[in-house]
Structures are given as C-alpha cells and as structure tokens.
Amino acid sequence: MQAYQRDFIRFAIDRGVLRFGEFTLKSGRTSPYFFNAGLFNTGSALAQLGRFYAAAVVESGIAFDVLFGPAYKGIPLASATAVALAEHHDRDLPWCFNRKEAKAHGEGGSLVGSPLAGNVLIIDDVITAGTAIREVMQIIKDQSATAAGVLIALNRQERGNGELSAIQEVERDFGIPVVSIVSLNQVLEFLADDPQLKQHLPAVEAYRMQYGI
C-alpha cells in the first residue's frame, strides 16, 4: 500500500465517508462498510480529495489529454483533480463536464469547459452498476474522442449479478483500465493494522469471501 492510499483511508474515515457497521445497499446486500463520497463536503476536504485523485492519476501512468467529470458527482471531483494536478504536479490540463439537460441558449449544448477531444480520463466516485459510465462512453464517442480510462475513489472488488464486478465488465466491454485511489484490498490491510478498527476486519473479510471477485 502506498502512503497516499493509507492517508486516503484515514481521511475518509475521519470525514465519516468510510464507515463500518451494518448497511443495506441498493443491491439488497447487507454490507459491513459504507462509502459516501458526498460527505467530502467542505472546501478543505475537496482540496485534499483532489490531491488524492491527482496522486492516483500520476501513479496510474495513464496517458490522457483531458479530464472529464460526469454530472453530477463527477463535476467537483474532476475540477479538484485538475487543480491538484496543476498545483502539485505541474500538469496544467483541460477539464470538462456534461449537463444532464442540454441548453438551447447561451453557449448551448450539453458539455461545459474544455472541448472533449483526444484521450479522455473519466473521474468519478465509484462504479456500482456501470450504467453511468456507459452513458459517459457514448458522450465521448459522440465527440469523436477516445476514453483513456476511468479513475474512481474506491473499488469495492465486488461482483454484480454474474461472476464479474461492474468494473471488470466496463474494462471488458470498452477495453480501458479502471483504476482507483484504493480498493477493498487496501481497506482490509488498513483494518488489520489499526488496533481501534481491527474489530471490523472479520465482518469485512466474510463479506469479501461471499461477494468478492
């Protein structure tokens, strides 16, 4: 585990974004942990989050020309990542996002910011079913651009209805890498090393055994 990954997990726990207990997911599964990126909801938290995303961008080695934040949750994530890449990694890159509803007046269209062109790195919080990413892939295709990859905060490493996870299905269907700041593997490693949180390790390990990929 990289230092920034350990720091991110601690940051997510401190902000109440990553919690342990018993949670019912949309899928109906009862999960021993829950991740809610919407709680990175202050200026300082968003700035710090952008730095973690930027570190993961650099670590991934994915070559790209523009950052894309899918509406709505991806918008602040892409902007914070762009700021952090410029300020901390000397990489001043264009970024853009889409509107849910296209505008007929003003600048018009459904895209805001930089032109969506070349190789595109998609920034989002999580991939649950993969539906949103499939919509984004169509937006990129419509602009004659190319998806270079997807970066998310947490990979739950959890299969869907079939044998693959939603992330694996996206990688298979579109031939692009999906990378994350952390995955469940690193969360398990963090729990094992933390005396206060170690009590949650058996439940998370059991969940991984049942639903993991």
Curated annotation (Swiss-Prot):
**Cofactor(s) in the UniProt record:** Mg(2+)
The entry's 5-phospho-alpha-D-ribose 1-diphosphate-binding residues are 26, 72-73, 99-100, 103, 105, 124-132
Q: What class of enzyme is it?
A: transferase
From the UniProt record, list the reaction(s) this protein catalyses.
Answer: orotidine 5'-phosphate + diphosphate = orotate + 5-phospho-alpha-D-ribose 1-diphosphate
Q: Which residues bind orotate per the record?
A: 34-35, 128, 156
Domain of life where this protein originates: Bacteria
- GO molecular function: any one? magnesium ion binding
Q: Does the keyword Magnesium apply?
A: yes
Q: In which pathway does it act?
A: Pyrimidine metabolism; UMP biosynthesis via de novo pathway; UMP from orotate: step 1/2
Entry-linked CDD domains? PRTases_typeI
One Gene Ontology term from the biological process aspect of the record: pyrimidine ribonucleoside biosynthetic process
Q: What is its EC number?
A: 2.4.2.10
List where this protein forms a coiled coil: none
What Pfam families does this protein map onto? Answer: Pribosyltran
Q: What does this protein do?
A: Catalyzes the transfer of a ribosyl phosphate group from 5-phosphoribose 1-diphosphate to orotate, leading to the formation of orotidine monophosphate (OMP).
Annotated NCBIfam families: pyrE (TIGR00336)
Q: Which family does it belong to?
A: Belongs to the purine/pyrimidine phosphoribosyltransferase family. PyrE subfamily.
- How would you summarize the oligomeric state and partners of this protein? Homodimer.
Q: What is this protein called?
A: Orotate phosphoribosyltransferase
